[in-house]
From Swiss-Prot:
Coiled-coil residue windows: none
E.C. numbers: 2.7.2.3
Family recorded in the similarity comment: Belongs to the phosphoglycerate kinase family.
Highest taxon listed in the record's lineage: Bacteria
Enzyme class, first EC level, given as a word: transferase
Subcellular compartments: Cytoplasm
Amino acids binding ATP: K202, G293, E324, G350, G351, D352, S353
Swiss-Prot/TrEMBL keywords: ATP-binding, Cytoplasm, Glycolysis, Kinase, Nucleotide-binding, Transferase
Name of the featured protein: Phosphoglycerate kinase
Reaction it catalyzes: (2R)-3-phosphoglycerate + ATP = (2R)-3-phospho-glyceroyl phosphate + ADP
Amino acid sequence: MSIKTVKDFSSFAGKRALVRCDFNVPLKEGSISDDTRIRAALSTIEYLKERGARIVLVSHLGRPDGKKNPKYSLKPVANRLSELLGQDVKMLSDCIGSEVVNSTLQMKDGDVVLLENVRFYAEEEKNDKNFAKKLSENGDVFVNDAFGAAHRAHASTVGVADYLPSVGGFLMEKEDKFLGGILKNPERPFVSIIGGSKVSSKIAVLESLLSKSNVVVIGGGMAYTFLHSEGYSIGKSLLEDEYIGIASSFLKKAKELGVKVILPLDHIVADDFNKNSIPEYIDSFNIPENKIGMDIGANTLKEIENVVKTAKTIIWNGPLGVFEFDSFSKGTAKVAEMVASCSGLTVVGGGDSVAAVNKFNLSDKITHVSTGGGASLEYLEGRILPGIKVLEN
């Protein structure tokens, strides 16, 4: 889909740009442990500053359940933004009300302020019209750059667009371009690598990508339900009984479409699901009845490598093993390295696979690392995201 962006807006000079960012960053004892999402918003903020806008930033943080809670204050974000932008970013004590509006009206061109957490109001997640109107009084134009919240029809992502001219920021544009490009017209061969623990959370993505892919790699905990549906023994591995038929139908449809599906050919197993469990290699599709599948084996990795090295487009979403346990993270690490060394277009989306490329310092070797967890998933499922829909041409 084609969205209107900041480049399509005639003049920002002297105008208050109400910019919805995704500053939902991890905090440890009040300090930001990963500022990726803050840095992702900088290009839009800098662009608006250069054009004389008065920048009013708005975001949510955590789940404060519609109540003011200092634990979820955006103050640490304002401090980090001040460092990154090299200027004072004033933190306002609220996100609506006459005091806040007056503060925004007294801003000078190039000033940046941050409103307090919009989720301190229950009306935010209900997309309450009155709340959206009050929020819109802090701006003259609405810029949505919060791709990570684009799948939510909330007051600050959708509601304010009813009251202000609305455009997307550069992050929103980039996500739309890369994820949209994969769904519309991927260069071939196109390989989809889908991992994660549950079929239930990934089946819609698998079905959406099946007709577009040349190869689909299925790994992680959900692979065992697919293996079981093919008659292999999976021991004590994760099994979703209600998805066995769906997994079987998916594999049948793949065969009909001529799409190659790679399932684990061999396994790293353990006696139980524990980070201290001893890894054991099984050179077979079948897993002994007293063992749990924890990661993919060397033969599976070789098979994946063969398709990845010739791929022109790769989408990777979800880890291939129990990535959070070091002894069982090798499969995911190796796949991250393969994707990073591919010369084609590579897109990584979904919290755990993004964490993997960051952990192994490979993010700069990936064409596009998506910032949206749930939003990326829903986009790849082919759903229309409300936060993007309001920006369409």
